[in-house]
Amino acid sequence: MEGIFAAYVLPALIIALKSVVLLVVLLIVVAYLLYADRKIWAAVQLRRGPNVVGPWGLFQAFADLLKFVFKEPIIPSGANKGVFLLAPFISAVLAMATWAVIPVNEGWAVANINVGILYIFAISSLEVYGVIMGGWASNSKYPFLGALRSAAQMVSYEVSIGFVIVTVLLTVGSLNLTDIVLSQNTGLGTMLGLPASFLDWNWLCLFPMFVVFFISALAETNRPPFDLVEAESELVAGHMIEYSSTPFLLFFLGEYVAITLMCALMTVLFLGGWLPPVDVWFLSWVPGIIWFMLKLCFCFFLFAMVKAFVPRYRYDQLMRLGWKVFLPISLFMVVATATFLKVFGLA
């Protein structure tokens, strides 16, 4: 009996505990990133932003949570009730499930699997189903049009993101996210005789891929200037028009968790994960999770600034950028990287 407990029950309990801790921390981080997003946007427009609930408005996200939870959920009379309520749940759960393999520090992951990047790509590809289900089940033309736009947009930019990831995998030689971070201890900087630093991270040697990934991540998560899924002037709120209360909150939560995931992926793939910017003794004392969170917040700051400054693209411009610009660039970089590694015997 003790053998069964040690072999099966105890590992399951540990994974469940890790999952609960990750979920709580993730929700708190998302709440304050949403607060930061609103504050940055307000600062650009010379406004104060959230400033009433708590000091400097720090508890605004939690007040919004209570507001959504206690509102009455309204379901359109012609909607497919089961699918209508299931869609936001699917979006939120799938968005949070992808975080199971993200290492925020060395050894700090719920599941440190050898195909972590493949797992993320597979799960995130399913998130579009929640949007499509919500748009179709609403039995309204505007949500349905928003869902169709979302499906086309996400599929288009997943191709570019996939090629970017292939380029990183060719360079590193592993699908394990921890291995990808540790491989960035050495790079262009150390080849030039410099100490380990941010010059060794993949953002420098794969800079075109870093730019393609960042812009594709904006489109994949429906962030401005690619928020055509919920363009206010055309589709009001897109697939979320008919949603209110907790179902709307779940859609909104799934969207921001996906944005945070893209920031975390940029950190892991290109910005050295939990590694300090320079390998010196006083920076090495700082816990790796602090460096990881600082890099994640920097990536989110870039997302927020793009939202504040860049005007929305037209739908044809969005599709042209994905298929006629990013796809050829990312495909060329895959071939160029593979050729370089083969010629110089690094493969």
Curated annotation (Swiss-Prot):
Location within or outside the cell: Cell inner membrane
Entry's EC annotation: 7.1.1.-
Recorded catalytic activity of this chain's protein: a quinone + NADH + 5 H(+)(in) = a quinol + NAD(+) + 4 H(+)(out)
InterPro entries assigned to the protein according to its UniProt record, in alphabetical order: NADH_UbQ_OxRdtase_su1/FPO (IPR001694), NADH_UbQ_OxRdtase_su1_CS (IPR018086)
Gene Ontology MF term list: NADH dehydrogenase activity; oxidoreductase activity, acting on NAD(P)H, quinone or similar compound as acceptor; quinone binding
GO biological process terms on file: aerobic respiration
Any single Gene Ontology cellular-component annotation: plasma membrane
Broadest EC class assigned to this enzyme: translocase
Pfam families for the chain: NADHdh (PF00146)
Entry keyword annotation includes Transmembrane helix: yes
Membrane topology, record value: Multi-pass membrane protein
Function: NDH-1 shuttles electrons from NADH, via FMN and iron-sulfur (Fe-S) centers, to quinones in the respiratory chain. The immediate electron acceptor for the enzyme in this species is believed to be ubiquinone. Couples the redox reaction to proton translocation (for every two electrons transferred, four hydrogen ions are translocated across the cytoplasmic membrane), and thus conserves the redox energy in a proton gradient. This subunit may bind ubiquinone.
Quaternary organization: NDH-1 is composed of 14 different subunits. Subunits NuoA, H, J, K, L, M, N constitute the membrane sector of the complex.
Family affiliation: Belongs to the complex I subunit 1 family.
Cited NCBIfam families: PRK06076.1-2 (NF004741), PRK06076.1-6 (NF004745)
Name the UniProt record assigns to this protein: NADH-quinone oxidoreductase subunit H
Organism: Brucella canis (strain ATCC 23365 / NCTC 10854 / RM-666)
Lineage of the species this protein comes from: Bacteria, Pseudomonadati, Pseudomonadota, Alphaproteobacteria, Hyphomicrobiales
